[in-house]
Amino acid sequence: MVVYTPFWNTLRSSGESTYTLIKNHHISSSTIDKLRHNKPLNTTTINDLCRILSCKVEDILLYVPSDDDQIL
């Protein structure tokens, strides 16, 4: 399972907020909702967040093994 816990720490230390992501950087409120609820994001959105926050992918998301993961 992918979680976005690192994103919230990165956002806090960046000087940005969910408001500025939406208003200044055109990140949708539905994307913010997906981040809040650990829902899937596409790689373009992850790339945009990394660019806006000047960070690496691992500063946005973390993989955590879960019993709920789909069996391959």
Locate predicted features:
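The DNA-recognition helices of helix-turn-helix-type DNA-binding domains
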Residues: 28, 39, 64-67
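A short, Lys/Arg-rich alpha-helix, primarily the initiator
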Residues: 1-20
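Short, charged recognition helix plus adjacent turn
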Residues: 9-10, 61-72
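Short alpha-helical DNA-recognition segment
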Residues: 15-33
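Short, basic-rich loop-to-helix N-cap that marks the start of a DNA-contacting helix
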Residues: 39-51
